[in-house]
Amino acid sequence: MTVHVALGTDIIHAHPQASGQNLGKVSYHDFRLFCSMAGELDGGGVFLNIGSAVILPEVFLKAVSVVRNLGNRLEEFTTANLDFIQHYRPTQNVLKRPTQNSGQAIALTGHHEIMIPLLAAALKASLEASDARPRGARLNRSSKQ
């Protein structure tokens, strides 16, 4: 988990003991960590933006740009935006721009309290199904048994 603080956006920033220096320092550390994780999406990774309409879509697009501008390959991954209303920034910065040359983008519109448990159940079922097959086993798609 990473935290990307937008100074002045949370009530705690007005507290006399809040340290802009410390918040900035750990946010920068987390951005670098996030860039490293974004680089691991290449070749089949999945990035989910769940309910963030402004900050995370911007951070994600910048992380993708950092990875690519450093000369690293970042293609063939999937992005998904889950929200009850599709907004401009997630559509552009999560779905369209990062995957425009390769990859897949999925927009799921609905209530989080319904979609997230359904997504978790689907992932769990998929993992259980893959664990049921012996390692190295392939599905036999021919009609011969």
Regions found by a protein language model. Give the residues of each.
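Short intrinsically disordered, low-complexity coil segments enriched in acidic
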Residues: 1-3, 142-143
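Short, conserved beta-strand edge motifs with alternating hydrophobic and charged residues
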Residues: 2-6, 47-51
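A general structural motif
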Residues: 3-6, 21-39
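Active-site rim beta-loop-alpha module in soluble metabolic enzymes
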Residues: 4-14
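Glycine-rich phosphate/pyrophosphate-binding loop at beta-loop-alpha junctions
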Residues: 12-18, 61-62
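Conserved short-loop catalytic and cofactor-binding motifs
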Residues: 19-22, 51, 107
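C-terminal functional extensions of proteins
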Residues: 33-36, 43-46, 53-144
